[in-house]
Design a protein with these regions (language model features):
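Generic short beta-strand segments
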Residues: 85-88, 201
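Sec-dependent signal peptide hydrophobic core
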Residues: 2-9
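Short acidic-glycine loop/turn motifs at beta-strand connectors
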Residues: 78-79
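Extended, compositionally simple hydrophobic/Ser/Thr-rich segments
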Residues: 33-34, 40-53, 100-102, 106-238
Length: 238
């Protein structure tokens, strides 16, 4: 009797695990679907998605994926933040990477996580500050123009960034990397930790810190007061 009960328990637990981790394999028929969203200034992406962001006069969201996977890709807007994510407990195996194309007149904050990528299809300009966050081995290629730009990376994420700003604030931790020589900033504040790397251009001043086995490389004629500790480094590049 005990053996039967134990066997039944194993079957039950195994079944629960299978349900909790349902796997959906792409059909191979990739299509594009329009989703309804408007009135947002912030974007929050998670779940191994390739995101293409464009500044345009009209708001739109298009999702490209296998036809049997589209239903598991959620798009919601609460009036200020557009959220795009894959359903919990569903393991998707798309034929190709899931792609999302976003157009909007204005962007203030973009958060990307879970091995997702973000690409700017044109230069994103703003009269206000722009805040970018990447985590969980995410990747970015950014083109921004705003009075203040903040970029924060964690968890082995990396991004390249170009454009123009007066004040740049950048942090990288957990073996992350910011490549920002092509972002023309006047003032820069940086924080590199945990074997991370930051590259930045600054024409007036640059401050902050570099710790652990991290490095900060900068171009421009900025006065530097970046503090370093441990095996970290701070270097001016030509």
């Amino acid at each position: 009797m005990k053996k039967i009960a134990l066997f039944s328990l194993i079957i039950l637990v195994g079944g629960c695990r299978e349900i909790a981790g349902e796997r959906v394999k792409g059909s191979g028929h990739v299509i594009t679907e329009n989703r309804t969203a408007s009135g947002f200034n912030n974007v929050d992406i998670s779940g191994a998605i390739d995101v293409y962001v464009k500044q345009d006069s009209v708001s739109s969201v298009k999702v490209e994926a296998d036809d049997n996977i589209l239903e598991y890709i959620q798009v919601h807007s609460d009036g200020s933040t557009l959220e795009i994510y894959t359903e919990n407990n569903i393991r998707l195996k798309p034929t190709n990477k899931i792609k999302v194309y976003i157009s909007n007149p204005q962007y203030k904050e973009i958060q990307v996580s879970g091995a997702s990528t973000i690409r700017c299809e044109n230069e994103i300009t703003s009269a206000d500050a722009i805040d970018i966050g990447l985590s969980g081995a995410s990747d970015g290629r950014l083109e921004l123009n705003a009075p203040k730009i903040s970029v924060h990376l964690t968890g082995a994420s990396n991004t390249s960034i170009k454009g123009k700003t007066k004040d740049f604030e950048g942090s990288a931790s957990g073996a992350s990397e910011i490549r920002g020589f092509d972002l023309l900033s006047e003032n820069a504040n940086v924080d590199a930790s945990g074997a991370s790397h930051i590259e930045i251009f600054a024409s007036v001043k640059i401050d902050g810190q570099s710790s652990g086995a991290s490095s900060v490389n900068y171009k421009g004629n900025a006065q530097s007061s970046v503090e370093k500790s441990g095996a970290s480094s701070v270097n001016k590049k030509d």
